[in-house]
Amino acid sequence: MHHYLPILLQIALVYLIALISPGPNFFMITQLSLAGRRGLGAASALGVGTGSTVWASLAMLGFATVLQRIDWLYNGIRIAGAIYLVWFGIKLVWASTKRGETIVVNVETPPAMRGAHFRAWRTGMLTCLTNPKSCAFWTSIFATLFPAHPPLWFYGVALAMIGMMSVGWYGSVALMFATERTQRGYRRLRRPIDGVCGALLVGLGAKLAAES
C-alpha cells in the first residue's frame, strides 16, 4: 500500500497545477458567484467536480483513449464545447449592455432557488464535460502516472481525491467571490466585469474551435 501513496501525491500535485490555472471552469464559477448567491457558485463548483470525476472515470476505463482515436467524435465534443463557451460568453456580454440585467435571476421562493441551484450545477458540469482538453489531460495522467494493474482501492481513492480537490478548489473560488464585500464591488462594476468575463469565454471558445 505504501508504495502507492507517492503515486497518489504525484497525481494530486499535477492536478492541483491544472486546477489553479484559469480556464473556462474558473471564469464560469467566478461569474456565477458574483452575479448570484453564494449557493449558486457552490452548486456550479459541485458540477465541475462531477464533470472532472466523470472524465477521470472514463480515462480509468479506457474510454477517453478510445475517444481521442475517433476523430469525428472527439472533434464533435470539441466543437460542442466551443459553441457552449461562446454562447455562455455572448450571454454575459449581452447582459453587460443592459442596465441592471444579469444572467442569473435571483428569486426568493425556495422552489425557484432549488431550480437555480440545479441549473448552476448543470452549467458547471457541462462546462467541464464539453472541454475535450479534460479528456486529453486525464488520458495523459493515467498513461504516465498510473501504475500497471493497481488494486481496486487505488482507483476508488484516486477518484475520491480528484472529486474532492475539484470541489474544494472551485468551492473556495465561489466562496471568495460571493462575499458581501465582493458582491458590493461587483454591483458597482457589474457591466464591465460581465463584459470582460464574457469576452474571455468567447475567446476561449473560439480558440477551442480553431484547434486541430
Feature locations, PLM:
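Hydrophobic/aromatic residues within the transmembrane alpha-helices of Major Facilitator Superfamily
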Residues: 16, 20, 53-54, 90, ...
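Selected transmembrane alpha-helices and immediately adjacent juxtamembrane segments
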Residues: 116-117, 124, 128-133
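Membrane helix-loop-helix hairpins that form the core translocation module of multi-pass transporters
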Residues: 39-119
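Alpha-helical transmembrane segments and their lipid-water interface positions
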Residues: 25, 51, 55-63, 85-91, ...
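Juxtamembrane transmembrane-helix termini in multi-pass membrane transport proteins
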Residues: 2-75, 140-157, 161
